[in-house]
Amino acid sequence: LYDQILEGMLDFIDGDDDADYTSSDVEICGSLLSKFISSVPEGISHDKAMVEVKTLVLALNELNEQCDFSLIETDQREGICELVFQTLAAAGVEFDEDVTEDWREW
């Protein structure tokens, strides 16, 4: 899933489309996602996990804004949300709603 998200972003750059972001922006996005995954270990408290979600989402908001709101499109948004949900589930954090929605601007 992680690779699919980033490959989708890179494919847009490589295509005929005129992207408002660079491969460096995609690398930054990948770093943010990797940092999130590693910051949510198994057994993390729900409250601490939500702090990590908020940190990720706000950082992605800022990055996407710097890219003229074109880095995170529908496919990437869905993939990022799914990656967040899978990471939380693997850590044993229960949730019953979209935990990114309160902060997400993409």
Residue ranges and their predicted role:
Residues 1-41:
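Short terminal alpha-helical segments
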Residues 1-4, 49-53, 104:
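Short intrinsically disordered, low-complexity coil segments enriched in acidic
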Residues 8, 12-16, 39, 43, ...:
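Surface-exposed polar/charged interaction patches
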Residues 17-25, 41-48, 69-72, 76:
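Non-transmembrane, amphipathic alpha-helical segments
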Residues 27, 34, 54-61, 78, ...:
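Generic structural signal for well-ordered, non-transmembrane alpha-helical segments
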Residues 30, 50-53, 97-101:
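Short, well-structured alpha-helical segments
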Residues 33-63:
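Mature extracytoplasmic domains of secretory-pathway proteins
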Residues 67-106:
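Amphipathic alpha-helical binding modules
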